[in-house]
Structures are given as C-alpha cells and as structure tokens.
Design a protein with these regions (language model features):
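Short, strongly hydrophobic alpha-helical membrane anchors
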Residues: 1-14, 254
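Transmembrane helix exit motif
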Residues: 66-74, 111-135, 222-223, 228, ...
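A helix-boundary/kink motif common to multi-pass secondary transporters
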Residues: 38, 50, 104, 108, ...
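Residues within membrane-spanning alpha-helices of integral membrane proteins
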Residues: 16, 59, 112-116, 120, ...
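Small-residue-rich hydrophobic segments that form or flank transmembrane alpha-helices
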Residues: 4, 14-83, 143, 147, ...
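Membrane helix-loop-helix hairpins that form the core translocation module of multi-pass transporters
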Residues: 53-125
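Cytoplasmic-side transmembrane-helix entry/capping segments in multi-pass membrane proteins
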Residues: 78-89, 110-113, 133-143, 173-180, ...
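Hydrophobic alpha-helical transmembrane segments in multi-pass integral membrane proteins
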Residues: 54, 95-100, 109, 149-155, ...
Length: 254
C-alpha cells in the first residue's frame, strides 16, 4: 500500500485509508444528491495530494459519477430542455478559463461561497419559494454563467443546481437537467487536463485504487435517493450547498 509515489514521496497506509474513505463518501454524496463529490473529497485529499492531482482525480471520478447518474436517469432526460444549458456552458467555460488571467480564483471562490451560505441558510429557514418561470434565453444565460464559473473555479454545478431548484421541478426532473450539464463541463475539463499532461501514471494508479470505494458509495447514495420525496431532496440540496459554501469560505491551511 506504500508503493504509490507522488512527487517523490510514498503515501502511507493512513493517507491511503483517508483517500479511500473520502472516495466512498464522495461517491455517496454524488449518488444521493447528484453533485458535491468534489467538495467532499477535496476537503480530505488536499491534505496529502497537490491541487493538480486532486483536480485531476475529481474530474476523473466526476466523469464516472455524473455519467452513471445520467445513465440512471436516462428515461427522464429531455434533451431539448438540456440543450440551452449545454450551449451556454460551451461558450462560458472558455470565457471563464480566459478570465483566470485577470481574476484571482481565491477571491471568486470566497464570493461564491458566501452566496451559497446565504442561499442555503435562507432556503432552510424559509418555506418553499414560488417557482421561477423560465425560457430558452434564461436557460442559455444560466448555462453561460455556469460555464464561466466552471472555467474560473472548476465548480460546474452550483448555478445550474440552484436554478433547477428555483424552477420548482420534481427531484428527478432537476437531476435530469443539472447532471447532463455538469457531465458536459467535466468532459471539457478532462480534455483540457489531458492536453496539459495532468493524467500521470501515479495519478491513474490512485484513481484505480479509489474506484471500488467511489462506485460503492455511488451505489449506496442512489439507493437512499430512491427513498427521498421531493421535500426531503430539496433539504438535502440546501444542506449540501450550505456546507459547500462554508468549505469555499474556510481558509485553506495546506
């Protein structure tokens, strides 16, 4: 177990244990809510992995978790409704990547975190809001904003997740929209990371090591998801958004 070497240092059995634990919990969060896997695992992995290694693993596992989620919900997918978000995201991701040269992502993450904390806290304290009407133009704009944020911070799901919740859709309808949109953004990131040479042999070894734990957590999360009604799912989303917001605001000590 100590044979995995990253940047010249071997991971000990304790670090590998935490790595596998985070993979399971991250898979569980993705199976239960359809997002938040990256925040769950990053909070642990960044203690012994570099940001690039963590990002590469999160994107790789995201391809699995979101792909599996889309496949599980394939009967409810409405591509005509999804298309405006993906088109907007395809434009937004490169814009966000370009803006990285001019904007400090750390400040942006803190700002996004504050908004998530406010939204999550308000949603948990208040009754369900009246559904917001949508349109193709609005959906494309949300996709654009979601793509810009994904390009800037690597966070492909928050704006689209909140929008789907504000629309007042049932839980399956929400996931049938925001998971394909997130999957499309992740595919773009996989291509970019592959071109950048981030997919090293050691990182792939770690990916394969954590794969069974991630799959197990994903399966358990989906099983529990099937037992949630729309009201309970809404609370799960709000709690995860609140936790994610706090995680973005909290100082990083690694």
């Amino acid at each position: 177990m100590d044979g995995i070497v990253l940047d010249g240092a071997a991971l000990g059995s304790t670090a590998i244990g935490f790595f596998l634990f985070a993979a399971f919990v991250g898979g569980f969060a993705s199976g239960l809510a359809g997002f938040a896997m990256g925040f769950v695992v990053s909070g642990i992995w960044l203690h012994f992995l570099t940001p690039l290694q963590t990002t590469t693993l999160v994107v790789g596992y995201g391809l699995l978790t979101q792909g599996y989620g889309v496949w599980k919900l394939r009967q409810t997918l409405a591509w005509r409704s999804i298309a405006p978000f993906i088109i907007g995201g395809a434009v937004g991701v490169p814009i966000g990547t370009l803006l990285l040269t001019y904007i400090d992502p750390a400040y942006l993450r803190s700002g996004v975190g504050l908004l998530l904390v406010i939204y999550g806290s308000y949603g948990l304290a208040q009754p369900k809001l009246k559904p917001v009407p949508g349109s193709v133009g609005a959906d494309t704009g949300i996709g654009l904003a979601n793509g810009v944020l994904a390009g800037l911070t690597g966070l492909p799901g928050f704006i689209i997740t909140i929008w789907c919740q504000l629309r007042g859709w049932p839980k399956d309808a929400q996931r049938a929209v925001f998971q394909p949109v997130m999957l499309a953004a992740i595919v773009m990131n996989v291509i970019a990371l592959s071109i950048a040479g981030a997919m090293t042999a050691a990182t792939m070894q770690l990916y394969l090591l954590g794969l069974p734990a991630m799959v197990a957590g994903l399966w358990v999360g989906f099983k529990l998801y099937g037992k949630l009604d729309d009201a309970a799912f809404r609370k799960v989303i709000l709690v995860l958004l609140l936790i994610a917001g706090l995680g973005l605001i909290a100082p990083r000590g690694w």
